[in-house]
Amino acid sequence: MAKQKQERRLPAAEAMCKVRTLRTSPRKLNLVAQSIRGLNVQRALNELEFSHKRIAQDVRKALYSAISNAENNHNLDIDSLVVAEAYVGKNLIMKRFSPRARGRATRVEKPFSEITIVVRELGEAA
């Protein structure tokens, strides 16, 4: 028995990409997400290409995926795409222990985060 087709959550002129496990804190990832919000996709790719932040390359891959989804799945024109939304969420926190003096140990938390990028096609009027 086949799965029933779900209704589309986004409007017709939008495409989305979601990356679930990025090994950085949401606070650091949000700095990169803020830098591309509202930009043309070509300009956003340039921003991410020359960013000094380590996580920017992973965000760049996600943006390429959103652009490919728009082009291949939704037949949108990639020259008129804009990053409509780029938002960040918390994910799991890996807990590790670090040895300290006198036989003690402290907990080290290694956070993961997730990012959702939505690209929108601008009409001719815009």
Curated annotation (Swiss-Prot):
One of its GO terms (molecular function) is structural constituent of ribosome. Keywords: Ribonucleoprotein, Ribosomal protein, RNA-binding, rRNA-binding. Pfam families: Ribosomal_L22. It comes from the Bacteria. InterPro entries: Ribosomal_uL22, Ribosomal_uL22_bac/chlpt-type, Ribosomal_uL22_bac/org-type, Ribosomal_uL22_sf. Belongs to the universal ribosomal protein uL22 family. PANTHER family: CHLOROPLAST 50S RIBOSOMAL PROTEIN L22-RELATED, LARGE RIBOSOMAL SUBUNIT PROTEIN UL22M. Part of the 50S ribosomal subunit. This is Large ribosomal subunit protein uL22. It comes from Caulobacter vibrioides (strain ATCC 19089 / CIP 103742 / CB 15). The lineage of its organism: Bacteria, Pseudomonadati, Pseudomonadota, Alphaproteobacteria, Caulobacterales.
